[in-house]
């Protein structure tokens, strides 16, 4: 697939509207899928840009690192945040099933301990940094 710079510019710009925030201190609940989506989307964008054929987000992250398209810190942070958020999502699904409810992605952080809240807030921060990096890499700030 051949793409041009304007495609990546527009796609990186489109991801800006999905900047995650975590409602851990309010009475609102958070859609955990909306926290994960920008991470997987930006990784897909970089994979497409550099011709990475990985099938999963983790595979793409690893191949981006092996190809020296991302540095070790981005590799480590992306994998950790992807793992933490998906672990939280699957834990929530299991809790729903055990309670006899249909699983969803809406998480109430009032029922979690401070560690879960902390790593979820950290994930949102890392994902926002990744969105900013994509904006810089694909020149969304200059137009």
Description of each model-found segment:
Residues 1-143:
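Conserved nucleotidyltransferase catalytic core and NTase-mimicking acidic/glycine-rich helix/loop elements
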């Amino acid at each position: 697939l051949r793409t041009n710079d304007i495609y990546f510019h527009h796609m990186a710009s489109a991801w800006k509207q999905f900047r995650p925030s975590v409602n851990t201190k309010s009475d609102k609940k958070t859609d955990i899928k909306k926290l994960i989506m920008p991470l997987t989307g930006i990784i897909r964008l970089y994979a497409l840009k550099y011709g990475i054929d990985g099938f999963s987000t983790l595979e793409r992250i690893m191949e981006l690192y092996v190809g020296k398209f991302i540095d070790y810190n981005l590799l480590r942070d992306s994998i950790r945040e992807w793992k933490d958020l998906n672990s939280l999502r699957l834990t929530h699904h299991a809790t729903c099933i055990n309670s006899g409810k249909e699983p969803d992605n809406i998480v109430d952080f009032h029922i979690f301990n401070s560690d879960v809240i902390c790593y979820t807030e950290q994930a949102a921060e890392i994902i926002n940094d990744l969105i900013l990096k994509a904006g810089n890499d694909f020149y969304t700030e200059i137009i």
